[in-house]
Design a protein with these regions (language model features):
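Helix-loop junctions on the cytosolic side of multi-pass membrane transporters
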Residues: 194-211, 403-412
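Helix-to-loop junctions at the C-terminal end of transmembrane segments
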Residues: 66-80, 170, 276-290, 379-380
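Intracellular juxtamembrane helix-capping segments at the cytosolic ends
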Residues: 125-139, 334-348
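Helix-loop boundary and gating motifs at the non-cytosolic
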Residues: 2-65, 230-267
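Transmembrane alpha-helix termini and helix-breaking/packing motifs in multi-pass membrane transporters
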Residues: 39-45, 72-76, 100-104, 159-178, ...
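C-terminal transmembrane helical hairpin of 12-TM major facilitator-type secondary transporters
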Residues: 291-337
């Protein structure tokens, strides 16, 4: 299934910087309106408890639909995949505006939050597959990994600066105004990233192929899973890392019920991405995909262990306690996507890459729908420690399974 890299990547310097600029703005916008941290925290903080628990399952259901649609969307977009990114960013911004303007009380507000999360899942899934396919077409393997890590770091720094110096001016000391201002800035960032996407330009000529139906998409995915051992390992490992990816949402819900500050979570999450960028870059160079995944799972387990100690000692309400846990959870999450892309982008044939990414992401979304609802519910049982123990056990299982990942991306 391996396919050689396209020649003359070294001559393409401009695409990297345009992709980095667009990705940085998009990352900052996503950080300020983060569906895994900001929206669940706001919902729980303002009394929309059941909605807070349902946000990630709703997002996952939308993600299932989005990943099912992504192969067809890529084929319809053809070489103009940058336009697909632009439209996706504009829709994402509009959805965040809906959350920002609705009164945060009652069933109607809860329904809006849930529906926006579901719609966001669709849009983000299509956008993610399109973005990964676009950078795979424009950049070499090394530059792809570098882009994913660096854009996350710079975008996070931008999010921290906005959170510290701009959002407080919008809030005027009022908590609700502060939360709404955060969402408005996030929407503005997403809209700006949509404009930047227009300047990315079309991809190189894509392979002509017939448009596949949903059934054909999954038929191809299962066929590759049966015939290619590397893809089976990739899918199983991705499924078991779903709890690691849910870590920040889990701790956001626990923090919202115990007096934590949203601005602290946004800043700490952004710092975690900044610190994680050079860390995982070094790990990838020395230990490859396996090192990134094992390290990610172990850091997630460390976050859970620290949370257990802090809650047992009555220290969870302190900024240093929940801030440290959030920092570790964010660092752990940051390695998962980059490692997965490094694993699949070289081994998958170019004409099947988008389909296989969408197929695997759909399976992960199915698991996350069930797991997210369960973890979202137990996370709000803040008077007991056993929910954190569950997260610790799942992280350890992920660490053990990830030992089967290749040390290098080309090692099947």
């Amino acid at each position: 299934m391996g396919v050689p890299l396209a020649p003359a990547f070294s001559a393409q310097t401009n695409p990297f910087w345009r992709l980095l600029s667009q990705g940085t703005i998009h990352t900052a916008g996503m950080q300020l309106s983060n569906g895994a941290v900001v929206l669940p925290f706001i919902a729980a903080h303002h009394g929309l408890t059941w909605a807070a628990a349902m946000l990630f399952p709703a997002y996952s259901i939308g993600s299932i639909a989005g990943h099912s649609l992504s192969p067809a969307a890529l084929q319809r977009a053809g070489q103009m995949r940058h336009l697909l990114l632009a439209v996706s960013a504009a829709i994402s911004a509009a959805l965040i505006v809906c959350d920002a303007v609705v009164p945060w009380t009652g069933v109607f507000a809860a329904a809006v939050f849930v529906l926006v999360s579901a719609g966001g899942g669709v849009v983000v899934a299509v956008s993610r597959v399109a973005y990964l396919d676009l950078i795979s077409s424009k950049l070499s393997e090394f530059r792809r990994g570098e882009l994913l890590l660096v854009k996350g770091a710079i975008g996070s720094v931008l999010a921290v600066v906005l959170t510290l110096f701009v959002v407080p001016m919008l809030g005027h000391g009022d908590t609700m105004a502060y939360h709404r201002g955060l969402l408005w800035l996030g929407a503005a960032g997403l809209a700006a990233s949509g404009l930047a996407a227009l300047f990315l330009g079309p991809v190189r000529a894509v392979s002509a192929s017939t448009r596949m139906s949903f059934r054909e998409t999954y038929r191809l995915g299962f066929a590759v899973a049966r015939s290619e051992p590397w893809f089976r390992r990739y899918v199983i490992t991705s499924l078991l890392f779903a709890p690691v990816a849910l870590g920040t949402t889990f701790y956001a819900l626990r923090t919202a019920h115990q007096g934590g500050g949203l601005h602290v979570l946004v800043i700490v999450t952004s710092i975690g991405l900044v610190l994680g960028s050079p860390l995982w870059s070094r790990v990838h160079r020395r230990f490859g995909v396996r090192g990134m995944l094992v390290g990610s799972a172990l850091v997630s387990a460390l976050a859970a262990a620290l949370c257990i100690v802090a809650e047992s000692c009555g220290l969870w309400q302190h900024i240093w306690a929940y801030g440290s846990v959030f920092l570790l959870a964010t660092v752990a999450t940051g390695a998962v996507v980059a490692a997965g892309i490094s694993w699949i982008s070289v081994l998958a044939a170019e004409q099947h890459r988008g389909t296989l990414i969408g197929f695997c992401s759909t399976l992960v979304a199915v698991v996350s729908t069930v797991l997210g609802g369960a973890l979202g519910g137990i996370a709000q049982k803040h008077t007991t420690i056993w929910p954190v123990v569950v997260v610790l056990i799942l992280s350890v299982i992920a660490a053990v399974v990830s030992l089967g990942a290749p040390r290098r991306a080309h090692a099947a």
